[in-house]
Amino acid sequence: MDVMAEPAADCVVKKSLRLSAPHGGRPRLLLAEDCDPVRIVTAAMLKGMGCDVEAVVHGEEAVRSASENEFDVIVLDIEMPIMDGITAARSIRSMGGPAAATPLMALSAFLADSVRTGEWRDTFDIALPKPANRNELHEAVKAALQRQRVEA
Protein backbone atom coordinates (compact mmCIF):
# COMPACT_ATOMS: atom_id res chain seq x y z
CA MET A 1 0.00 0.00 0.00
CA ASP A 2 1.40 3.42 -0.99
CA VAL A 3 0.93 6.26 1.44
CA MET A 4 1.72 9.79 0.37
CA ALA A 5 2.56 12.11 3.19
CA GLU A 6 2.04 15.81 2.87
CA PRO A 7 5.02 18.06 3.61
CA ALA A 8 5.28 19.11 7.21
CA ALA A 9 3.75 22.52 7.80
CA ASP A 10 6.89 23.83 9.48
CA CYS A 11 8.91 23.12 6.31
CA VAL A 12 6.71 25.56 4.43
CA VAL A 13 6.87 28.08 7.25
CA LYS A 14 10.67 27.91 7.47
CA LYS A 15 11.02 28.49 3.74
CA SER A 16 8.72 31.51 3.86
CA LEU A 17 10.58 32.98 6.84
CA ARG A 18 13.87 33.35 4.95
CA LEU A 19 15.32 36.85 5.08
CA SER A 20 17.79 38.54 2.78
CA ALA A 21 19.96 41.59 3.35
CA PRO A 22 19.78 44.76 1.26
CA HIS A 23 23.07 43.70 -0.37
CA GLY A 24 21.48 40.38 -1.38
CA GLY A 25 23.40 38.14 1.01
CA ARG A 26 22.61 36.81 4.45
CA PRO A 27 21.53 39.55 6.86
CA ARG A 28 24.09 40.31 9.59
CA LEU A 29 22.46 40.98 12.94
CA LEU A 30 23.86 42.03 16.28
CA LEU A 31 21.80 40.71 19.20
CA ALA A 32 22.37 42.08 22.71
CA GLU A 33 20.47 40.09 25.36
CA ASP A 34 21.61 39.31 28.91
CA CYS A 35 19.28 36.36 29.56
CA ASP A 36 21.07 33.23 28.29
CA PRO A 37 17.96 31.21 27.31
CA VAL A 38 16.37 34.17 25.50
CA ARG A 39 19.64 35.01 23.72
CA ILE A 40 20.15 31.38 22.64
CA VAL A 41 16.56 30.90 21.42
CA THR A 42 16.39 34.29 19.66
CA ALA A 43 19.74 33.72 17.95
CA ALA A 44 18.61 30.25 16.85
CA MET A 45 15.37 31.65 15.40
CA LEU A 46 17.30 34.34 13.52
CA LYS A 47 19.82 31.82 12.20
CA GLY A 48 16.90 29.66 11.07
CA MET A 49 15.70 32.64 9.02
CA GLY A 50 19.04 32.78 7.22
CA CYS A 51 20.72 35.46 9.34
CA ASP A 52 24.30 35.59 10.57
CA VAL A 53 24.08 36.54 14.24
CA GLU A 54 26.64 37.96 16.63
CA ALA A 55 25.26 37.67 20.16
CA VAL A 56 26.52 39.69 23.13
CA VAL A 57 25.32 39.95 26.74
CA HIS A 58 25.16 43.69 27.47
CA GLY A 59 25.00 47.11 25.88
CA GLU A 60 28.67 47.95 26.27
CA GLU A 61 29.59 44.88 24.20
CA ALA A 62 26.96 45.89 21.63
CA VAL A 63 28.42 49.39 21.28
CA ARG A 64 31.93 47.98 20.91
CA SER A 65 30.83 45.44 18.30
CA ALA A 66 28.80 48.05 16.37
CA SER A 67 31.87 50.30 16.23
CA GLU A 68 34.06 47.47 14.88
CA ASN A 69 31.64 45.68 12.49
CA GLU A 70 28.85 46.46 10.07
CA PHE A 71 25.40 44.99 10.71
CA ASP A 72 22.14 45.13 8.80
CA VAL A 73 20.07 45.29 12.02
CA ILE A 74 20.96 45.71 15.70
CA VAL A 75 18.58 44.12 18.24
CA LEU A 76 18.90 45.40 21.81
CA ASP A 77 17.22 44.20 24.97
CA ILE A 78 16.14 47.25 26.95
CA GLU A 79 17.11 46.05 30.43
CA MET A 80 20.69 44.71 30.57
CA PRO A 81 23.52 44.96 33.09
CA ILE A 82 26.55 47.23 32.62
CA MET A 83 24.82 49.27 29.89
CA ASP A 84 21.09 49.14 29.14
CA GLY A 85 19.70 48.98 25.62
CA ILE A 86 18.52 52.58 25.52
CA THR A 87 21.95 53.92 26.46
CA ALA A 88 23.58 51.53 23.99
CA ALA A 89 21.21 52.62 21.22
CA ARG A 90 21.92 56.29 21.84
CA SER A 91 25.67 55.60 21.89
CA ILE A 92 25.42 53.73 18.58
CA ARG A 93 23.38 56.54 17.01
CA SER A 94 25.92 59.15 18.14
CA MET A 95 29.05 57.34 16.92
CA GLY A 96 28.52 58.26 13.27
CA GLY A 97 29.44 56.09 10.32
CA PRO A 98 27.47 53.05 9.15
CA ALA A 99 26.47 52.03 12.69
CA ALA A 100 24.57 55.28 13.25
CA ALA A 101 22.33 54.52 10.26
CA THR A 102 21.76 50.85 11.11
CA PRO A 103 18.14 50.03 12.02
CA LEU A 104 17.81 49.48 15.77
CA MET A 105 15.20 47.18 17.29
CA ALA A 106 14.18 47.34 20.95
CA LEU A 107 13.38 43.96 22.50
CA SER A 108 11.97 43.82 26.02
CA ALA A 109 9.66 41.91 28.31
CA PHE A 110 8.83 45.26 29.92
CA LEU A 111 8.21 47.18 26.74
CA ALA A 112 6.41 50.36 27.69
CA ASP A 113 3.66 51.79 25.54
CA SER A 114 5.90 54.82 25.01
CA VAL A 115 8.36 52.69 23.04
CA ARG A 116 5.66 51.16 20.86
CA THR A 117 3.98 54.51 20.24
CA GLY A 118 7.22 56.08 19.08
CA GLU A 119 8.38 58.17 22.02
CA TRP A 120 11.90 56.81 21.42
CA ARG A 121 11.58 56.99 17.63
CA ASP A 122 14.78 59.06 17.48
CA THR A 123 16.63 56.06 18.95
CA PHE A 124 14.79 52.87 17.94
CA ASP A 125 13.23 52.10 14.58
CA ILE A 126 11.20 49.12 15.77
CA ALA A 127 10.08 47.82 19.17
CA LEU A 128 9.17 44.19 19.81
CA PRO A 129 7.79 42.85 23.11
CA LYS A 130 9.16 39.62 24.59
CA PRO A 131 8.43 36.85 24.34
CA ALA A 132 8.26 37.11 20.57
CA ASN A 133 7.41 34.11 18.46
CA ARG A 134 9.19 33.28 15.23
CA ASN A 135 6.60 35.02 13.03
CA GLU A 136 6.68 38.24 15.08
CA LEU A 137 10.47 38.27 15.09
CA HIS A 138 10.55 37.62 11.34
CA GLU A 139 8.14 40.48 10.61
CA ALA A 140 10.09 42.91 12.80
CA VAL A 141 13.47 42.05 11.27
CA LYS A 142 11.98 42.10 7.77
CA ALA A 143 10.60 45.59 8.43
CA ALA A 144 13.99 46.72 9.73
CA LEU A 145 15.75 45.35 6.65
CA GLN A 146 13.25 47.08 4.36
CA ARG A 147 13.74 50.31 6.28
CA GLN A 148 17.46 50.05 5.62
CA ARG A 149 16.83 49.50 1.90
CA VAL A 150 14.74 52.67 1.71
CA GLU A 151 17.31 54.78 3.56
CA ALA A 152 20.36 53.32 1.76
Give residue ranges: language-model regions:
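Alpha4 helix (beta4-alpha4-beta5 surface) of REC/receiver domains from two-component response regulators
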Residues: 87, 110-130, 135, 139
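Receiver (REC) domain active-site loop signature in two-component systems and cognate sites
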Residues: 80-83, 92
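Hydrophobic/aromatic residues positioned on beta-strands within the core alpha/beta folds
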Residues: 105-107
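C-terminal catalytic ATP-binding subdomain
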Residues: 1-19, 142
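Conserved acidic carboxylate
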Residues: 33
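Active-site beta3 strand of CheY-like receiver
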Residues: 70-75
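Helix N-cap/capping motif at the beta->alpha junctions
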Residues: 55-64, 85
